[in-house]
UniProtKB/Swiss-Prot annotation:
Name of the featured protein: Putative H(+)-ATPase I subunit PS8
Domain of life: Eukaryota
Additional facts recorded: On the 2D-gel the determined pI of this protein is: 7.1, its MW is: 22.1 kDa.
Native source species: Pinus strobus
Length: 20
């Protein structure tokens, strides 16, 4: 579902932010 994908993208974005 779109909502699930959006949530996953959010998590990935947060992980990338922590890695930076």
């Amino acid at each position: 579902e779109v909502e699930m994908l959006g949530d996953e993208l959010r998590t990935l974005n947060q992980n990338l932010g922590l890695m930076r």
